[in-house]
Every structure is written in C-alpha cells, then in structure tokens.
Amino acid sequence: AHHSQNRLVHRQQHKAEMRVAQEQIEFYRDLKSKMSTKMVGETLEEHCSTTFEMQLRPHMPYAKFGKDNKTVDGTKGDFIFSNSDGETEYISIMFEMKNESEETEKKHKNVDFLKKLDEDRKKKECEYAVLVSTLEADSDLYNTGIVDVSHLYEKMYIIRPQFFVPLITL
C-alpha cells in the first residue's frame, strides 16, 4: 500500500510541475504575440543601429546611419546609410527592415516588399536598396548570405540581419 501511495504522490507532483510549465509556455506565447509586429520591427532596427555604432562607426568617421524621418511624396524608408570622404558622398543605401511575426496569418515573401523599396530608394535618391529581413526563415537562399536581386530591381539586395556589417563593408 505504501508503494502505490508513493507513486500517487509522484504522479500528482508531476502533474503540478507540468501545469506550471504549461502556464509558463502560455505566458511567453502571450507575451510574444503582444510584442506586435512593429515592436519586432523596432528590435530589428535597433539591432542594425547598435551593430553600426559598435562595429562600423570607428572605421567610418563620416558615415551616417539613421532612421529616415523625412517623408518625400508620401514615402519614408526605414533607414538610410551614407558615407563620404568628408566632403563628397560616395555611397547611399536605403534600408527596409522586415520581420516575421509568428502571429501573422499571411506569410509575406521578401519579394512582396521590393517594389516599394525601389520606389523609396528612387524618391530618396539613394544608390542602393537593401531589404533586411527575417521573412522566409527556412529559405536556404536567404540564409546563406547576401542575395543580389538586381535582376528584378537595380542595385538591390536582400540580407539577414547578421549580414548587415558584411554588406556595408563590401
């Protein structure tokens, strides 16, 4: 009788632990869905911004990398990077950040955003356009490096956040 009572106690403990674990999972799931797509987008922007300041700023004294706040013809990109020799700008890149929110039913593809990015780049007179994206997470094409999509839109690339520095230093 003692043996079966021990098993019963263990089973009840196990059930209680499982309930707590399940509640934690629900809590984090809920938290993650509350972090709206915009917030997730913000964190991608923060990632690139911080990376730029820490890794690239020391080597590029005249470079500018910042949020595009000027609306031109109803257009605003996410970020613009430009660099100069102190007087003459010799490169400018329009960046658009896209992040997959797991709660979004509609799965966007990277190519869905290229037309608008190209329009933004032209209106802002940037030489290059880059989509920094976590969309299509299981795509080998995007996971292996810098993807040149210039055959679709001139001077345009799609990258994962970890290729941000390699792209700018090309």
What are these regions (language model features)?
Residues A1-K34:
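Residues forming the hydrophobic interface stripe of long heptad-repeat coiled-coil alpha-helices
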Residues K34-M39, E45-L170:
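Amphipathic, heptad-repeat alpha-helical coiled-coil/stalk segments that mediate oligomerization
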